[in-house]
Amino acid sequence: MTLQRAAQPMPVDIAEILAEQRLRDAYDDRPAYQRNDYLAWIARAKRPETRTKRITQMLDELAEGGVYMGMRHRPSRR
């Protein structure tokens, strides 16, 4: 049995921020589970401040590379 999480839609504001900061390619290079987890994590924020903080963390990790949800990770071999 394979467990699958529901695919998260890309919010317009996040797509715009990724484009503005030229991080869309870094986002797209991540494995599908990471992209989906980032969006689900951001969507679960109850307060606007929390959502903003999570978006900022995602952007920082994409810019730095080799970091996912505060943990080191090897880049995928695409």
Language-model features: locations:
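Charge-dense, helix-prone N-terminal extensions
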Residues: M1-R78
